[in-house]
Amino acid sequence: MSTSSVRFAFRRFWQSETGPKTVHFWAPTLKWGLVFAGFSDMKRPVEKISGAQNLSLLSTALIWTRWSFVIKPRNILLASVNSFLCLTAGYQLGRIANYRIRNGDSISQLCSYILSGADESKKEITTGR
């Protein structure tokens, strides 16, 4: 590849509507940090993972994945990072659901735990009720 073609490719990337001078580049680039945090949480014990946090990550990832195809210019980088965020948050929610159901929680208890993070056994210990 000649230096002129490399310069042309770099100039084209630099001046692109989704290039590094725009939020269309930096927002998805920095959002990869959330994906990497989700990957690192796969090593954490499931009891220490927040259901509410992963539900909100899943929700925003779904919304922004859809939105990245609606906005002009269409932003594939934003769609890709949010797709991976959706996968990691969904996986973590699956881990939480599997753990809670195997330990005897009903579906309603599981939903309550994911939405509020409240654990009835912890309330009894801390409040004395």
Swiss-Prot record:
Main localisation: mitochondrion
Per the entry, induction is: Mainly expressed when grown on glucose containing growth medium.
Against InterPro entries, the record matches this protein to:
MPC (IPR005336)
The answer to whether the entry has keyword Amino-acid biosynthesis is: no
Give Gene Ontology CC terms. inner mitochondrial membrane protein complex; mitochondrial inner membrane; mitochondrion
Q: Which residues lie on this side of the membrane: Mitochondrial matrix?
A: 2-22, 72-74
Q: Does the keyword Membrane apply?
A: yes
Membrane-crossing ranges are: 23-39, 55-71, 75-91
GO molecular function annotations of the record: pyruvate transmembrane transporter activity
Q: Where is the signal peptide?
A: none
**GO biological process terms held by the UniProt record:** mitochondrial pyruvate transmembrane transport
Could you tell me which residue ranges are on the Mitochondrial intermembrane side of the membrane?
A: 40-54, 92-129
**Which cysteine pairs are covalently linked by disulfides here?**
none
Q: Topology versus the membrane, per the UniProt entry?
A: Multi-pass membrane protein
Which reaction(s) does the protein catalyse, per the Swiss-Prot or TrEMBL entry? pyruvate(out) + H(+)(out) = pyruvate(in) + H(+)(in)
> What does the record say about the knockout?
Grows more slowly in amino acid-free medium (SD), when combined with disruption of MPC3.
Cellular compartments annotated: Mitochondrion; Mitochondrion inner membrane
Record key words, sorted: Membrane, Mitochondrion, Mitochondrion inner membrane, Transmembrane, Transmembrane helix, Transport
A family per Pfam:
MPC
Q: Which family does it belong to?
A: Belongs to the mitochondrial pyruvate carrier (MPC) (TC 2.A.105) family.
This chain's function reads: Mediates the uptake of pyruvate into mitochondria.
Q: What else is known?
A: Present with 3410 molecules/cell in log phase SD medium.
Q: Which PANTHER family match?
A: UPF0041 BRAIN PROTEIN 44-RELATED (PTHR14154)
Assembly and partners are described as: The functional 150 kDa pyruvate import complex is a heteromer of MPC1 and either MPC2 or MPC3.
What name does this protein carry?
Answer: Mitochondrial pyruvate carrier 2
Q: Which organism is it from?
A: Saccharomyces cerevisiae (strain ATCC 204508 / S288c) (Baker's yeast)
Q: Source taxonomy lineage?
A: Eukaryota, Fungi, Dikarya, Ascomycota, Saccharomycotina
Q: Which gene encodes it?
A: MPC2
